Amino acid sequence: MSAVTLTPGRAALAQWRAIRDGAPLRLDPACRPGIARAAETVAAIVARGEPVYGINTGFGKLATVRIAPDDLATLQRNIVLSHAAGVGAPVPAGIVRLMMALKLASLAQGASGVRPETVALLDAMLARGVTPVVPGQGSVGASGDLAPLAHMTAAMIGVGECLDAGGARLPAAAALARADLAPLDLGPKEGLALLNGTQFSTALALAGLFGAEDLLRAGLVTGALSVDAARGSDTPFDPRIHALRRHRGQIDAADALRRLLAGSAIRASHLVGDERVQDPYCLRCQPQVMGAALDLLRQAGATLETEANGVSDNPLVFPETGEALSGGNFHAEPVAFAADMIALALCEIGSLAERRISLLVDPALSSGLPAFLTGRPGLNSGFMIPQVTAAALVSENKQRAYPASVDSIPTSANQEDHVSMAAHGARRLLAMAENAAAVLGIELLAAAQGCDFLAPLRSSEALERVRARLRAAVPRLDEDRYLHPELEAATALVRDGAVVAAAGLDLPGVDGR
């Protein structure tokens, strides 16, 4: 995998995806002078003795408490230890790695006041595969993602646990030593700078975005295959229809469906003499639904790309004037809104697919396919219960899609009286994506089975490649058998990108392609 050169303030979504996936990271050396200037500004503030939040005061509701010069290092260590109060299952290592890279990019912009050696340690941990163990719960998305980032920072000072480059879990101090790194002694403001920020929420939201983008593409493929299995029409995908409505996502989704179905002998077989006038919405309105989901993902992607390239620390250091200004960039409301948009898109991708599965198993709607896609209905139940499973998963996602950003609860003795819930809103996306992937896996199986009943007619070249890829892993269902491993196999083909890769077409995504 090619190395990513991280230029703070100018990183693209594709670079963040590569970092999440384990690409080697190189910090642009051009940022070093700015880091040093900001650190010198903090040192000057300490020398002057003027009260500045987080440098020589307490935190949160305790901001009015002045801290003696001899206690400044203890203050920074204490905030890390006291704030490392997360609970729950650890976050996947790839997301922690992404969080670390986001924090690195923020610190490297020279507005946080940390020393070059602090940035260098975080950079080295990424380079040498030292990944802190970070519990998934405990952030409300303001004042930043304090608890998760405290667990990251605790590892930097040799406290807590890490995964080493081989994935072994061990004490943080031992992991640092194994990587030939020394624990950090925090300087003024550094504990707060490392804890304050939206990097945990943003990492989770980016992971959710990437997963949703993959599933949207897979959903276009399985949706097109369902059109052929149900002997549906491609007329609703005519570009003239969508040009009149002007929504970019809808236009792109319709174009993708047309290309996926191009050359289908199944479609050609019922161009003449078919008395059906219009298909049900789950087939006919795919461009409108999937296109709207694509537009949501693109909007969320733009927000998250901006957030990933910003600085969400507090206070912020301005070396040109020697000031440290208190603000609220740690409030993750933009990330929370983006996560809510991604959740809506994931919910609808799965919901529309489940409706297509329901259509395929119902002989009253499937245009000649046998009940539950089995040759001997009654003796065999076929795809009866996979459709029920899809319905269950879609219903779970409907509950999870409720906006997290509208829920706020005051913290820190009411000093932090409005919070974003971005971390919770972004973390649920991982489970929602798993559910949606399973629904699409079931649709893949059902649509391929439906096409099997239409033999010797064949679908398009793109969709026949998809069917062949599936059949290499899962045979046709002729008689009832134990289905769980086959559902898992089909879901893996969706999740891992094999379905989209087999289609061999450039399908639309968040970057506008």
Curated annotation (Swiss-Prot):
Enzyme class of the recorded protein, top EC level: lyase
Modified residues (2,3-didehydroalanine (Ser)): S143
Keywords, comma-separated and alphabetical: Cytoplasm, Histidine metabolism, Lyase
Origin: domain of life: Bacteria
Location in chain, cross-link 5-imidazolinone (Ala-Gly): A142-G144
Subcellular location, record wording: Cytoplasm
Keyword NAD found: no
GO MF terms held by the record: histidine ammonia-lyase activity
Annotated disulfide bonds: none
EC number, as in UniProt: 4.3.1.3
Catalytic reaction list: L-histidine = trans-urocanate + NH4(+)
A Gene Ontology term for the protein's cellular component: cytoplasm
GO biological process: L-histidine catabolic process to glutamate and formamide; L-histidine catabolic process to glutamate and formate
Pathway recorded for this protein: Amino-acid degradation; L-histidine degradation into L-glutamate; N-formimidoyl-L-glutamate from L-histidine: step 1/3
Principal subcellular localization: cytoplasm
The record's account of how the chain is modified after translation: Contains an active site 4-methylidene-imidazol-5-one (MIO), which is formed autocatalytically by cyclization and dehydration of residues Ala-Ser-Gly.
InterPro entries on file: Aromatic_Lyase (IPR001106), Fumarase/histidase_N (IPR024083), HutH (IPR005921), L-Aspartase-like (IPR008948), Phe/His_NH3-lyase_AS (IPR022313)
Family note: Belongs to the PAL/histidase family.
Record's protein name: Histidine ammonia-lyase
Upper taxonomic lineage: Bacteria, Pseudomonadati, Pseudomonadota, Alphaproteobacteria, Hyphomicrobiales
